[in-house]
Amino acid sequence: MSGPMETIGAVMVGIAIAFLPAIADAIDVKLDDAALRKAVEEGKQIKDVKNIQVPRFGADLSKDICGGGGEIRTKTSGLQRLGALIAADPDRAERDKPQVEQAIQKTADAKELKIAFDFCGDTPDFAEDAQATLEQDGRMIKGEMGKPDKAKKNTEGPAYRGKIAASFPYGTFNPTAPTKITLYPKVGEAMSWESDFSKIK
């Protein structure tokens, strides 16, 4: 027979579990094989890469091409993209099966989260030397910047638009926390956006 203290202990454990943060929809740091295959199958059902819902922040590019923002390229969205590519050309995917499996595993094993920023500037090299950070609970995490994409000319507004990606090792940030994402162009003011990582898959 359990005593009063054991009963209280069980109740307290139940309360603690009830208030644990829900991480099922947080950014995936590690995927088991079932989750990996599920993401690929979801992509196959979507079929068209353009319809893959990559988590996004900032401006809607269809309405404001120079509004600033970007994509949070999670493992799940990357695997869905590969699934869509497989569905688009299944014969080729079957012929190149070893390479396809390698690409899937490489995406699942990625050690860094990539965030790709899109923004505009007045010169072809406007995206060079940009920096990016994540801020969580007062802590700043600096990203490792990649080489920017070649700038494209605009028909109106700033003369050029382009992309640059920043990589953040998974162990350096909390994948379930509200996050402030900031881009620091070499010319002009910094741009910041709020994103709740607990709601991103």
Task: List each language-model region with its residue ranges.
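Bacterial N-terminal signal peptides that target proteins for export
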Residues: 1-12
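Bacterial N-terminal signal peptides
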Residues: 11-19
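Conserved functional micro-motifs across diverse proteins
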Residues: 25-179, 184-201
